[in-house]
Design a protein with these regions (language model features):
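Long alpha-helical, hydrophobic tracts
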Residues: 1, 17, 29, 38-43
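Polybasic, low-complexity association/targeting segments
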Residues: 1-23
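Alpha-helical phosphate/pyrophosphate-handling elements in metalloenzyme active cores
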Residues: 25-35
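Membrane-inserting effector segments that mediate pore formation, membrane fusion
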Residues: 47-76
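Intrinsically disordered, low-complexity, charge-dense segments enriched in Lys/Arg
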Residues: 101-201
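Transmembrane alpha-helical segments and their cytosolic interface motifs
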Residues: 33-53
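Membrane-interface alpha-helices
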Residues: 65-96
Length: 201
């Protein structure tokens, strides 16, 4: 059972992450393009960019549209946190972006305490990020092919331009932790259903 204080802190946190998602996406692009970072880190960064900018059609209700980015916002931070190891270059990358990495471990622990197995579901996605396909191309292609990278970058710009979340919309729409977890549960169920359909095909 989580305390009211933890729950309101979680809501506050996710609100902030939702507002900063376009900025955080730029940090993921920086990680993807940073040749000093180990290749696996860059692949995770590219994968999480593709995950975030892919349209998620399952949320048709405008009211939920804002909150439907919550899994993207949490996954982006989770992926970068998990991918970046203790190496010197990785450490200096973290230091360049304190707004994303400072206190992140504690914040993710807070998310886990509220989200429970939904957090486990997101954690399990991190390992699959480098293997996803985006617009018919493998993620590695976006690292190795200039034209593909340009396309991903353009899609990132479009995403940031069209992103419907700001301080005002988020304060109106997001007041309770269950608002976030309910939408994530639907996303998880939708994904499981899609996998089931694929498996039967």
């Amino acid at each position: 059972v989580t305390s009211i204080a933890a729950e309101s802190k979680f809501v506050e946190l996710v609100r902030g992450w939702l507002v900063s998602l376009p900025h955080d996406l730029k940090i993921a692009f920086d990680a993807m393009d940073d040749e000093n970072l180990p290749r696996p880190v860059r692949e995770v960064a590219a994968g999480v960019i593709a995950y975030v900018v892919s349209p998620n059609d399952f949320v048709s209700d405008r009211h939920d549209a804002v909150v439907s980015y919550a899994d993207d916002a949490v996954l982006l931070r989770l992926a970068l946190q998990k991918a970046l190891g203790p190496g010197e270059d990785e450490q200096s990358f973290r230091e360049r972006f304190p707004e994303l990495f400072e206190g992140l471990e504690d914040n993710l622990t807070l998310c886990k305490s509220i989200m429970g197995e939904l957090m486990t579901w997101l954690e399990s996605k991190v390992a699959t990020l480098p293997t996803i396909e985006y617009k018919g191309k493998k993620i590695t292609k976006y690292l190795d092919d200039e034209e593909a990278r340009e396309q991903l970058f353009e899609d990132g710009l479009v995403f940031r331009t069209d992103y419907p979340v700001d301080e005002k919309t988020i304060t109106d729409k997001l007041k309770k932790a269950t608002t976030i977890t309910d939408v994530m549960k639907r996303r998880q169920a939708e994904e499981a259903r899609a996998k089931g359909v694929k498996a039967r095909a």
